[in-house]
Amino acid sequence: ETLIGILMTTVICSTLFLGITQAKLYLEAIRVKEKAFIELKNFTNEWKSMVAAGVSNFPSDSNSGEKVPLKIDSNGNTTLEGNLYKKITKATNSGQYSIYYNIQTYITWDKKNLFFNKEKSLLDTLSFNTYQIQFNIQ
């Protein structure tokens, strides 16, 4: 009886600890996604304002994109990094008097450290697809 009681207690405690660990990892994934959303929103707004101001030549992204820290440890070291990308094209319906651009932005980050994932390349992505008119400021 004692051995069965000890075994049941061990199973229940290990299940409880596994549940607590999964909950912590899930909350951390939500924090990372929230930080990625904020970075992507700021990046998109920056390019929208540049289009609105009249910038018409847009540098192409490098293969790695623009790097931003998504998770920083207590020493200030970056532990998780995201990559921001953009694709800005003149809209097909854009006319002579109303010039507007399609702005596609997205951020990717590696989520292999979350939820005990063993896969080598497991990326998560958030993306925006918006339009911005170019103001004729003279």
Describe each PLM feature range.
Residues 1-19:
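N-terminal single-pass transmembrane signal-anchor helix
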Residues 7, 21-138:
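Flexible, low-complexity segments enriched in proline/glycine/serine and punctuated by aromatic residues
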